[in-house]
Amino acid sequence: MNTRGYYKLFPNLYVLFIGPSGVGKSSSSSIGIEILRETSLKVNIYKDFITPPALMEFMSRSSVSTEYQFGGKTVITQKTPLLLYASELGNLLSLRSGIRELTLLLTELFNKQGDHEDTTNKRGNIKIKKPNVTFFACCFPEWIEEELVSISLRSGFLGRMLVVTGSHKRHRSPSIRLTPEDVELRKDLIHDLEIIGALYGEFKWSPEAEQMWSTWYYDQPMDMTTDGMEIAGFGSRREQFAQRLAILTAIGRGNDLIITADDLKTGISMVRYCENNIRSMGATSDEHKVIQKVRKNLTTFCKRVPNTNIDLGLLMQRVSKWANKRKLEEILEQLALEGFINVRGRTIIIQGPFED
């Protein structure tokens, strides 16, 4: 997608899955990786530990040529697509691998235009042909605070991340088996990925989407100093993320290379969800305790009465000793984004799941 005439924006993403052990971070990510491996797409996949020089050398050897049919002609492109995956982010970003150097390299490659050149002690000058890096990683909530201590790194590196959080399992089954429908879905996904991999060209806005984009874009704040550094890094790229997610939504919908208003709505919605997750990452342990107290109060309501609808004023009375109105609104927004509740006017609708 051409952006303001200065550079092309590609829908590569850096995604960080954060949650406690057992919620399915690595398992769900691995399923997607394995499905991608079963396609014929020319995507280089590197998993877990690697040093910056080794990553540079791996990418320099991983350039691929791909043929596309475009406008009745055959177009041959040369680029370096890479999926870097870490089932535990601590295995990838460690003192042994050079956490600062690797985060700085990934930061630079996030929106790289054209070729990338660097120098290593072993091979000297290295050139990577049009790198396009997608990064998936999983970690515990405590890892960010304990290991990624540099605020400058957190602002630059995490500012390029879409953060997805989970606090509990959504499904429980004593015996998980693939059903015939699951097997068929897997085949359909592989087939769709093959079609997506053959797409070539530039995405365009539909008239309605372009109008929506302009309105939303000009509504975004210009001053990033009011937020902490972690969220300011994300906020400065909020528009980029909305575009990238809208493109990916459009790809999942069809092959016309047109971004519709619905595609953009989905992209903006996901940006808001991830931004709220990043804000929660900066919360103190005391703030997390308050969130859990509100969640527990809502759960208690539902266990005592059959109705899952709760009046906002009644909840405010119960929590007024340790949460003012503004703080409660922030907490309810977080719980709504997690899917635990739905707020309609002054009514809170509990959706669960409920923890014992």
Go through the PLM ranges and name each one.
Residues 1-356:
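Phosphate-handling catalytic cores of nucleic-acid transaction enzymes
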